[in-house]
């Protein structure tokens, strides 16, 4: 995987494992709510009363309902990606 996934995947995985409720805002302004059931390189499965497959290219923002703590990087690959990538 490319370096762009070094933050995205652990973040989504933490939200999934902890079943954190999220609001997902799409690029067209629509707000979806639920919890992340699964995800891959291209899509996120969002579970609420139904499961929705949301394509990542349509997602603008993912907002967790509560603060989420990411696991600390153990391999050092995350260390240089934080300061200048805004």
From Swiss-Prot:
Disordered, as annotated region: 67-86
InterPro entries found in the cross-reference section: Hfq, LSM_dom_sf, Sm
Key word Aminoacyl-tRNA synthetase present: no
Gene3D superfamilies reported for this sequence: 2.30.30.100
Biased composition (Basic and acidic residues): 75-86
Molecular function (Gene Ontology), one example: RNA binding
Domain (Sm): residue spans on this chain: 9-68
Any GO BP: regulation of RNA stability
Swiss-Prot/TrEMBL keywords: RNA-binding, Stress response
This protein's GO CC annotations: cytosol
Listed Pfam families: Hfq
Assigned protein family: Belongs to the Hfq family.
Described function: RNA chaperone that binds small regulatory RNA (sRNAs) and mRNAs to facilitate mRNA translational regulation in response to envelope stress, environmental stress and changes in metabolite concentrations. Also binds with high specificity to tRNAs.
NCBIfam families assigned to the protein according to its UniProt record, in alphabetical order: Hfq, PRK00395.1
Oligomer and partners: Homohexamer.
Record's protein name: RNA-binding protein Hfq
Lineage of the species this protein comes from: Bacteria, Pseudomonadati, Pseudomonadota, Gammaproteobacteria, Pseudomonadales
């Amino acid at each position: 995987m490319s370096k762009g996934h070094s933050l995205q995947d652990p973040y989504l995985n933490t939200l999934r494992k902890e079943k954190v409720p999220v609001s997902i805002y799409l690029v067209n302004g629509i707000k979806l709510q639920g919890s992340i059931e699964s995800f891959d390189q291209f899509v996120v499965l969002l579970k609420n009363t139904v499961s929705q497959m949301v394509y990542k290219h349509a997602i603008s923002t993912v907002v967790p309902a509560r603060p989420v703590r990411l696991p600390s990087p153990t391999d050092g690959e995350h260390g240089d990606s934080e300061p200048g990538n805004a």
